[in-house]
Design a protein with these regions (language model features):
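Basic nucleic-acid-binding interfaces
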Residues: 1-139
Length: 139
């Protein structure tokens, strides 16, 4: 297994927390170009690292992004996502606004919502069985 999927250590934790994040532009417009995506990937990677996380995979279509992330358990997922959206929006507005402004209305780039799911580890049924089968003390 690759190093990126191994256990990570924090100051007081050992963790393996992976998430699949999907971000969409406002109104799910088809706005992304290859040039934008080539610039967004290292920006997202750097932003994750600044917050103690890790960008493991980056993929996209014209109207949405897929990111596989490792986020430390001490970090708020909503704050983490907010930082990713904020820095990327700032970049896109600064460098590509002329290309996208006609496809969006108003001043916002990202939809206010996002989709995130935890991933990796054992299937839920296996974890459930493991927890159920713990030996409780008889006292």
């Amino acid at each position: 297994m690759q190093d990126e999927f191994n256990w990570r250590r924090g100051r007081t934790t050992v963790f393996k927390c992976f998430y699949h994040l999907v971000l969409t532009p406002k109104y799910r417009r088809d706005v992304f170009t290859n040039e934008m995506l080539d610039a967004l990937e290292p920006l997202m990677k750097e932003t994750c690292e600044q917050m103690g996380g890790e960008l493991l995979e980056f993929g996209a279509e014209g109207d949405h992004l897929h990111l596989m992330l490792s986020i430390p358990p001490a970090k708020s997922i909503s704050n983490f996502v907010g930082k990713l959206k904020g820095k990327s929006s700032y970049y896109l507005r600064k460098h590509h606004w002329e290309e996208v402004k006609n496809k969006l209305w108003g001043e916002h780039f990202w939809s206010p919502s996002y989709c995130i799911a935890s991933c990796g580890g054992a299937p839920l049924e296996i974890v459930k069985q493991y927890v159920e089968n713990q030996n409780r003390p008889s006292k």
